[in-house]
Amino acid sequence: MVLVRGGYKLEKFLQLLTVLLQEAKDPASLLKRLLTILVAVIIFLFVSNTSEVMSFLKTFSTSAVLQDVQTQRIDNFPNVAREKSMVLFSQTGADAVFVVKYKPDAINDYSNIIAWESNAQLDRADLADKAVNKTSELYRRHLEGFNYASDLTVKVNKYMGKNIPSFKNVIFNYIYTCPYFNLNNIYAGYIGIAWRDKPVDIADSEQFKEYLTKLCSPQQRSLGRSI
């Protein structure tokens, strides 16, 4: 029944086009008729495929909005990272707080410092992309969702892999790190809270880590929601 009705409409439409062309008496009239036919064809196709057209427009509109939101989120992420670094720098009294982001997204071949809060100045070389050591204890612990303290005052097996690239102008012997995960729950980078010297004695180490975990947790979540 639907096919018959659709065929009937198409037949009537073709008859209308034939009449319009036959009534053209000169080139100017023919051009006007052709423009009229073009408009008629567009209207006919739209009316005949209303559901498909509306579905396409809805999908296109949704995709465009989502893409725009994602672009704004990416562009604003460094600002969010700087804000979180400032908060933790004030709360912890650390010598430096920084945010590292991995790239390409979900591949994590390189790391880059996108926010830095400290009285120490970073060298330009420290801001360059650094290859990620995925065999390091830091990376493996972060993948599992755990925070990790990199303590250079404790000797470790040299084959474990370097956790954090060295800084050119300053040495940090203790860096507490908190991983953050993006909206797709993919490990995207980490927050580093750094001291030149270990800030507490070994006896207070675990309590100190618990304290840093509490401070870092809301900033981790905020970064994750922003990327």
Swiss-Prot record:
Stretches assigned to the Cytoplasmic side: 1-33
Alphabetical keyword list: Cytolysis, Disulfide bond, Host cell inner membrane, Host cell lysis by virus, Host cell membrane, Host membrane, Membrane, Signal-anchor, Transmembrane, Transmembrane helix, Viral release from host cell
Any single Pfam family the record assigns to this protein: Phage_holin_T
Molecular function via GO: pore-forming activity
Membrane topology value: Single-pass type II membrane protein
Ranges facing Periplasmic side: 49-227
Disulfide bonds: 178-216
Keyword Membrane: yes
Main location: host cell
Post-translational modification summary for this protein: Disulfide bond is required for functionality.
GO cellular component: host cell plasma membrane; membrane
InterPro entries: Phage_T4_GpT_holin (IPR020982)
Upregulating conditions: Expressed in the early phase of the viral replicative cycle.
Localisation per UniProt entry: Host cell inner membrane
Membrane-spanning ranges: 34-48
The record's note on its domains: The C-terminus serves, in association with the antiholin, as a DNA sensor for lysis inhibition under superinfection conditions.
Function: Accumulates harmlessly in the cytoplasmic membrane until it reaches a critical concentration that triggers the formation of micron-scale pores (holes) causing host cell membrane disruption and endolysin escape into the periplasmic space. Determines the precise timing of host cell lysis. Regulated by specific antiholins that somehow sense superinfections and then delay lysis. Participates with the endolysin and spanin proteins in the sequential events which lead to the programmed host cell lysis releasing the mature viral particles from the host cell.
Membership in a protein family: Belongs to the T4likevirus holin family.
Protein name per Swiss-Prot or TrEMBL: Holin
